[in-house]
Amino acid sequence: MDKSKRLFLKSKRSFRRRLPPIQSGDRIDYRNMSLISRFISEQGKILSRRVNRLTLKQQRLITIAIKQARILCLLPFLNNEKQFERSESTPRTTGLRIKNK
């Protein structure tokens, strides 16, 4: 085999096929919180289809279910817990005044 044909041959590497994130028996519904919470980031954002490894139809149904759950207050729109956390080492003394006599 000459050199020009050899460059186009692909190496045959084996790969493990991942399980689909949604099985055929799972119902995509706004009440199914255990299923919906797998497709939301820590900040509360809907993860993309590439990250979720979903089909187009599944991603659309998941997005609709998440939005319905948000409207019905089952899910938060944003999850900003880190913003409100305070470190224990720094005491809060901004409002205290000491009188000097």
Curated annotation (Swiss-Prot):
GO molecular function, one term: structural constituent of ribosome
InterPro entries linked to this entry: Ribosomal_bS18, Ribosomal_bS18_CS, Ribosomal_bS18_sf
Subcellular location as annotated: Plastid, Chloroplast
Keywords carried by this UniProt record: Chloroplast, Plastid, Ribonucleoprotein, Ribosomal protein, RNA-binding, rRNA-binding
Cellular component per GO, a single term: mitochondrial small ribosomal subunit
GO biological process annotation, one example: translation
Principal subcellular localization: plastid
PANTHER family, per the entry: 30S RIBOSOMAL PROTEIN S18, SMALL RIBOSOMAL SUBUNIT PROTEIN BS18M
HAMAP family noted in UniProt: Ribosomal_bS18
Subunit structure comment from the entry: Part of the 30S ribosomal subunit.
UniProt similarity note: Belongs to the bacterial ribosomal protein bS18 family.
Name of the protein described by the UniProt record: Small ribosomal subunit protein bS18c
